Amino acid sequence: MTNWYNVGRLVNTHGVRGEVRVLSNTDFPEERYANGSVLKVAKSPQAEGTLVTVRSHRTHKNFDLLTFEGYNSINEVECFKGSYLYVSEDQLSELDEHEYYYHEIIGCTVVDEEGTKLGKIKDIIETGANDVWVVDRQQRKDLLLPYIEEVVKEVDVENKRIRVHIMEGLDDE
């Protein structure tokens, strides 16, 4: 079974020639939406969906505009509105050291330097300067951890475990 990873949401059509407007959540739009790239359009990663091949890609305002081979009019792509775009696992590129895909981080257990479990990462917020990892602490307020060297000490993706240093002021409870 192939694993599929979300790279964007089809928010609307654009024009009448089969172009779709995509709100991307990938750091690699040029790679993901390159001509000839195969994507899955579906409501969820488990859904069967429709495989499409990218014919063209351009940016417009804060959106990526795509056309797909075989889809030449607004009527043919209207049904994709509200769906998500997914890439298969074999299309993921190798990342540099200390770079991770969101799916590798979300769900990891977070422990402090003494090994005390703090919770699990449930979301990642992009701030511009650095990402912020949201830790679900059950019955407590979420802990927001900036992804910076001074806080994140070790990431073990294979064991889904992250060791952190809680700087003064990070945990108000």
Curated annotation (Swiss-Prot):
GO terms for biological process: ribosomal small subunit biogenesis; rRNA processing. It comes from the Bacteria. One of its GO terms (molecular function) is ribosome binding. One of its GO terms (cellular component) is cytoplasm. It is found in: Cytoplasm. Residues 97-170 form the PRC barrel domain. It holds the Pfam family RimM. InterPro entries: PRC_barrel-like_sf, PRC_RimM, RimM, RimM_N, RimM_N_sf, Transl_B-barrel_sf. Keywords: Chaperone, Cytoplasm, Ribosome biogenesis, rRNA processing. Binds ribosomal protein uS19. Belongs to the RimM family. An accessory protein needed during the final step in the assembly of 30S ribosomal subunit, possibly for assembly of the head region. Essential for efficient processing of 16S rRNA. May be needed both before and after RbfA during the maturation of 16S rRNA. It has affinity for free ribosomal 30S subunits but not for 70S ribosomes. The PRC barrel domain binds ribosomal protein uS19. This is Ribosome maturation factor RimM. It comes from Shouchella clausii (strain KSM-K16) (Alkalihalobacillus clausii). The lineage of its organism: Bacteria, Bacillati, Bacillota, Bacilli, Bacillales.
